[in-house]
Design a protein with these regions (language model features):
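A generic structural signal for solvent-exposed, polar alpha-helical segments
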Residues: 19-20, 51-52, 74, 96
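Charged/polar, solvent-exposed surface patches and flexible loops
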Residues: 30, 34-41, 92, 96
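Enriched for short, Lys/Arg-rich terminal
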Residues: 1-11, 57-100
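A short, surface-exposed loop/turn module that caps and links secondary-structure elements
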Residues: 36-62
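Arg/Lys-rich, positively charged N-terminal/basic patches that mediate binding to nucleic acids
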Residues: 1-37
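General structural signal for secondary-structure boundaries
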Residues: 11-14, 43, 47, 86
Length: 100
């Protein structure tokens, strides 16, 4: 499978789940997909090193390596991934700074 085909397949995976993406490297998309599959199979978010945000306890941040995060929301006891974003963008959002 070519890298462009792989990227297209991964993008489709996230689109089917209505997960917003920013421009992430291929290895990050692959790891994020594995983590999302584990969530969908019932793995508790804390076993994926996820933590609830202090500012909004319904939001869970799951690390995807050192520089990326999946933001998910607790909807009726189910953790639903909503966004994949860089750690820099994550920090800006939670510090209340405007995006570039």
């Amino acid at each position: 499978m070519t890298p462009s085909r792989t990227r297209a397949d991964l993008t489709a995976f996230f689109e089917r789940r209505n997960i917003q993406l920013c421009k992430a490297p291929l290895h990050v998309l692959l790891k994020a997909r594995r983590l999302i599959h584990r969530l969908e199979q019932g793995t508790p978010y804390w076993q994926l090193h996820g933590k609830r945000l202090a500012s909004d306890r319904s939001v869970v941040s799951i690390p995807v390596g050192r520089d990326w995060r999946i933001l998910a929301r607790d909807i009726s006891g189910r953790i639903v991934p909503q966004e994949l974003l860089s750690h820099e963008r994550y920090n800006r959002r939670h510090l209340g700074l405007k995006y570039r």
